[in-house]
């Protein structure tokens, strides 16, 4: 997308126009209402389960606690939204990898327009549905079995049905927020789930500081300072762009001669935004969930022990977790950059518009230049994201403050990233409303 030098509205102008735009108010109300609905649904219980005993077991298991944060406490409350949006995110990862690997799916996404994208979305829903059943069955048989009041085929059926229906409903809410509300539905749901667990985490941190004396207070303050520096760094990465100058050739329309003008092609330092972090976290959560489902399930035999060993190796704070997490961030950063910006398509579009990059020949040379710039930007962005994501792990180990369960960095990255992306969407909507108003003026 080529942009000119038009000045973006300030934050004050944005919020002033938000108050005046009925359409934006409606979108915000829809988004807030749907998010509240999902939070309420978390506390609708699955029947015939000793929830108090199960919740205590979850609190004592840091591996499942890692998964519980991303469901906003839905797993510990054993609600119908126990799996939350995670099956849909896992399905999206699978579908995007398949799209990149299978030419027919890639052609469907790129060349079939809106109809093709709808088919891809439909395939993602089918995968999410199957994934819900698998995870629901694993949750019921592996985790909930010791806490069931009347365990049997009927209990398994009704529990899997309730959890699957709940997760599919959350998926529908996510798509509804994306289409009718403000922001990305899946990202906002994870954002709200993390925010919901923050009071408990902060309370535990304050309790740790109060009980440990001056040394503990110093450790907590140091950790908070690291988080503050991280916020500044995250904003820098999310907002950082490389502006490539674009020169449009002179052209004559009728008797008017339009002179050569310069605009810019902005390439973000972090093209994928917060999605590489969310997807990397979802991949790392998968072994934890499989280990939780395998615990106490004798039917899995040796596989259950393998799942547990993999989960222990990928426990937050271990060197294996740090390395795998960084590799996943790199992979999804490059993967998302390739999906969002296609140098070949950009080069062709510039050539069609009669535009070019100064000093670069149109066509293949422009494509190679853009590809090189994009790769360098993505590499720098991925390094910074990996550093920011793993730094608090070492700080926690040095200070002894482990109340964030190794998820503080990931949570902070998601919270700040989603907040920035949502604010940008609101600003874009305000700008579009401004131009629509100018066009409608007589």
UniProtKB/Swiss-Prot annotation:
One GO biological process this protein is involved in is:
SRP-dependent cotranslational protein targeting to membrane, translocation
Instruction: List the keywords (alphabetical).
Output: Cell inner membrane, Cell membrane, Membrane, Protein transport, Thylakoid, Translocation, Transmembrane, Transmembrane helix, Transport
Asked if the keyword Transmembrane belongs to this entry, the reply reads yes
Give the highest taxon in the source lineage.
Bacteria
**Localization annotation:** Cell inner membrane; Cellular thylakoid membrane
- Give the membrane topology, semicolon-separated if more than one: Multi-pass membrane protein
Q: Name one Pfam family in it.
A: SecY
Molecular-function GO term, any one: protein transmembrane transporter activity
Single GO cellular component term: plasma membrane
Where are the membrane-spanning stretches? 29-49, 69-89, 126-146, 153-173, 182-202, 217-237, 274-294, 320-340, 377-397, 400-420
Q: Which PANTHER family match?
A: SECY/SEC61-ALPHA FAMILY MEMBER (PTHR10906)
Family named by the database record: Belongs to the SecY/SEC61-alpha family.
Functional note? The central subunit of the protein translocation channel SecYEG. Consists of two halves formed by TMs 1-5 and 6-10. These two domains form a lateral gate at the front which open onto the bilayer between TMs 2 and 7, and are clamped together by SecE at the back. The channel is closed by both a pore ring composed of hydrophobic SecY resides and a short helix (helix 2A) on the extracellular side of the membrane which forms a plug. The plug probably moves laterally to allow the channel to open. The ring and the pore may move independently.
Q: How does it assemble?
A: Component of the Sec protein translocase complex. Heterotrimer consisting of SecY, SecE and SecG subunits. The heterotrimers can form oligomers, although 1 heterotrimer is thought to be able to translocate proteins. Interacts with the ribosome. Interacts with SecDF, and other proteins may be involved. Interacts with SecA.
Q: Which NCBIfam families match?
A: 3a0501s007
Q: Which HAMAP family match?
A: SecY
Its protein name is Protein translocase subunit SecY
Identify the coding gene. Answer: secY
């Amino acid at each position: 997308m080529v942009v000119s030098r038009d000045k973006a509205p300030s934050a004050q102008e944005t919020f002033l126009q938000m108050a005046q735009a009925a359409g934006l108010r409606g979108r915000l109300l829809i988004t807030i209402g749907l998010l509240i609905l999902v939070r309420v649904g978390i506390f609708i219980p699955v029947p015939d389960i000793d929830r108090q005993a199960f919740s205590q077991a979850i609190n004592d298991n840091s591996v499942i606690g890692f998964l519980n944060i991303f469901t906003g406490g839905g797993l510990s409350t054993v609600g119908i939204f126990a799996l939350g949006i995670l099956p849909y995110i896992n399905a999206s990862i699978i579908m995007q990898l398949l799209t990149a690997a299978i030419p027919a799916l890639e052609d469907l996404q790129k060349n079939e327009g809106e109809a093709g994208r709808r088919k891809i979305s439909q395939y993602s829903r089918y995968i999410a549905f199957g994934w819900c059943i698998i995870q629901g069955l694993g949750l019921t048989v592996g985790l909930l079995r010791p806490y069931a009041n009347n365990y049997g085929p009927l209990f398994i059926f009704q529990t899997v049905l309730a959890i699957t229906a709940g997760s599919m409903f959350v998926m529908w809410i996510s798509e509804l927020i994306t289409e009718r509300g403000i922001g990305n539905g899946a990202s906002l749901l994870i954002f709200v789930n993390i925010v919901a667990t923050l009071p408990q985490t902060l309370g535990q941190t304050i309790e740790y500081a109060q009980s440990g004396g001056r040394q503990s207070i110093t450790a907590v303050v140091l950790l908070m300072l690291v988080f503050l520096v991280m916020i500044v760094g995250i904003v820098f990465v999310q907002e950082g762009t490389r502006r490539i100058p674009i020169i449009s050739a002179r052209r004559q329309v009728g008797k008017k001669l339009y002179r050569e003008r310069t605009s810019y092609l902005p390439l973000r330092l972090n093209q994928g935004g917060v999605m590489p972090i969310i997807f990397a976290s979802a991949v790392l959560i998968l072994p934890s969930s499989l280990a939780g489902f395998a615990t106490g399930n004798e039917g899995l035999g040796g596989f259950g022990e393998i799942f547990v060993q993999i989960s222990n190796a990928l426990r937050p704070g271990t060197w294996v977790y740090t390395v795998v997490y960084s590799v996943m961030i790199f992979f999804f950063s490059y993967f998302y950059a390739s999906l969002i910006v296609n140098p070949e398509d950009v080069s062709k579009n510039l050539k069609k518009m009669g535009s070019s990059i100064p000093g670069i020949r149109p066509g293949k040379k422009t494509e190679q230049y853009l590809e090189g710039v994009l790769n360098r930007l993505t590499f720098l962005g991925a390094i910074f994201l990996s550093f920011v994501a793993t730094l608090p792990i070492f700080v926690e180990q040095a200070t002894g403050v482990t109340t964030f369960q190794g998820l503080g960095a990931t949570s902070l990255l998601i919270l700040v990233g989603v907040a920035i992306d949502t604010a940008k969407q609101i600003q874009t909507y305000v700008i579009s409303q401004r131009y629509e108003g100018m066009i409608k003026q007589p």
